[in-house]
A protein has these predicted regions:
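Residue-level detector of conserved, function-critical positions
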Residues: 24-521
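Bacterial Sec-dependent N-terminal signal peptides
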Residues: 1-25
């Protein structure tokens, strides 16, 4: 028996032991679905047209153009991508890489603020500044606050003192340095307020008694008994308007009073309206004002003048569309035109704007539809009606969504849990947790049987079903089988990535016994 067993072993040259482990395989196709390559990564992230990230286990890499690991990103996950900076998170904190692959900050910080050529990092109350132009990191110290402005200035605060460490005079302190959505920093010194440009230089000397930002590069101030409207400029700021009469700036409304009476509605750089008899002004939208007069007229004022001429028997006028403006009288809403004439009498509790000559209205909790002549198109039986686009509106009743045409007729008899309009006239629909697609005439092109659905472009719809992903066209024809864990599309580089799990076979070879063994050994 032993002899037979020995002979059997001698006839076996190799013995295979298979061990299994799970890995992730990616196939890369062009947009004509021709296979280009195969990759082994757990995850691939496309951060931009040129920045691609690959992950294998705990190893995170910046990939080359041929999708090979080019730079190890050290950390375990991408924290944020703010071009050109890749913020990477690791066990000890956040660090930063330039998208070209250079590591500029170790993974040890709690927060990192980014600008296109610099980074501001912090741990607790300690701050560091990396400047790409000098390729160096500078310790700024223990601070109460530090920030990068939208023009790239560094402002720091310690106690009640502010300074700019990158300016030509980094040791100079200020009582206040405040940035805004404009291009200038509001500065305060003992001598007064001024404005500082992106170079850190004064373009308005600090001599103004009071100064506050309004919008953009404009400021409202007071100095030597004069009210000032100032516009920032990179070389020298300009006083656009000045007056010894009182100018107020409250609730984002600027008004001028002459001898104690309201006379002018102001904009950032001067007079918007000069009229007598005004009693009050209320802001009703961006650059939109209801102006009230002593003779009980009300008008709607816009950036370029009257949108609705002052008129009687109105309490409020809202922004409008298609030449009609919602307006209220005695607590009810109707529509007026730009001449200040009632077109649709005030009879509704609430209205929407007109869209394609149709608007929604309600008198109770339910909404209906009227046309621009005030004729009822749809009864007030809807919980919600969204604006008409290309002849269709999305409407909700009894918790379900329907498509409503301009005759007030629903195009789908069975409601959906939700309907989303796409940019090119299609409709994504959901029912019982499944998604589908309707065309511009509300006809079903993809049935509501998918767990997820994303229309990338014409005839290319990424779908998920039973936990797997694929691509179909708008007639339901399969483009890529619904058999993958994930699909990524990089249209700019003509690439489609499909992810799949597979189980590789690892073969362990046991060599045959050596023929040189002595007999009987």
């Amino acid at each position: 028996m032993n002899k037979n067993f020995t002979l059997l072993v001698s006839f076996i040259l190799t013995f295979f032991i298979s061990e299994t482990s799970t890995a992730q395989s990616w196939e890369v196709y062009n947009t004509q679905l021709q296979l280009q390559s195969r990759l082994i990564y757990d995850e691939i992230d496309l951060l931009s047209e040129t920045v691609r990230i690959g992950k294998r286990g705990n190893e995170l890499s910046l990939l080359s153009n041929d999708f090979k690991p080019a730079v190890s990103l050290v950390g375990t996950e991408i924290y944020q991508y703010l071009e050109p900076w890749i913020l990477v998170k690791g066990p000890n904190g956040i660090g930063a890489f330039h998208e070209y692959g250079q590591q500029v900050l170790p993974l040890e910080y709690e927060k990192i603020q980014t600008y296109f050529n610099m980074l501001l990092a912090s741990k607790g109350n300690e701050y560091w500044l990396f400047q790409r132009g000098f390729n160096k990191t500078t310790y700024l110290g223990e601070l109460d606050e530090a920030k990068i402005t939208n023009t790239g200035l560094i402002i720091i605060r310690k106690g009640d003192e502010y300074s700019m460490p990158l300016s030509t005079n980094p040791d100079k302190t200020f009582e206040l340095l405040s940035d805004n959505d404009g291009e200038f920093v509001l500065a305060k010194e003992p001598s007064g307020f001024g404005l500082i440009n992106r170079e850190g230089d004064y373009v308005l000397d600090p001599i103004i008694e009071t100064l506050q930002h309004t919008h953009g590069n404009f400021y409202y101030g007071f100095n030597q008994d004069q009210y000032l409207l100032i516009e920032g400029n990179d070389i020298q700021s300009n006083i656009r308007y000045n007056s010894f009469h009182k100018i107020t700036f409250e609730n984002d409304i600027m008004l001028e009073y002459i001898h104690g009476k309201l006379r002018r509605v102001m904009e950032d750089d001067g007079i918007l309206l000069d009229d007598v008899g005004m009693t009050k002004v209320e802001k009703v939208g961006k650059d939109l004002y209801n102006v009230y007069f002593r003779d009980e007229k009300v008008g709607l004022l816009g950036k370029k003048g009257w949108l609705v001429q002052p008129m009687l028997e109105v309490e409020e006028i809202k922004n409008g569309s298609e030449g009609l403006f919602p307006a209220s009288s005695n607590g009810a809403f109707g529509f007026v035109n730009s001449a200040g004439t009632w077109v649709i009498p005030a009879q509704y509790a609430e209205t929407t704007l007109f869209s394609e000559n149709f608007a929604a209205y309600r008198n109770t909790h339910n909404w209906g539809v009227i046309n621009s002549s005030g004729e009822q198109v749809a009864n007030a039986s809807w919980e919600e009606i969204k604006p008409f686009q290309k002849g269709l509106a999305i409407a909700k009743a009894n918790g379900k969504y329907f498509l409503l045409n301009t005759f007030g007729t629903t195009l789908n008899t069975e409601g959906f849990d939700d309907i989303y309009r796409t940019t090119d006239g299609f409709f994504m629909v959901e029912r019982s947790g499944k998604s589908g697609l309707l065309d511009s005439e509300a006809k079903e092109v993809i049935p509501t049987e998918f767990e997820g659905l994303r229309r990338e472009r014409k005839d290319f719809v990424i779908v998920q079903k039973d936990g797997l992903t694929g691509v179909i066209n708008e007639t339901g024809e399969i483009i890529i089988p619904v058999a993958y864990e994930k699909i990524l599309v990089d249209w700019a580089n003509d690439k489609i990535f499909t992810k799949n799990s597979f189980t590789p076979t690892v073969i362990q070879i046991i060599e045959e016994p050596s023929k040189k063994n002595k007999r009987g050994a």
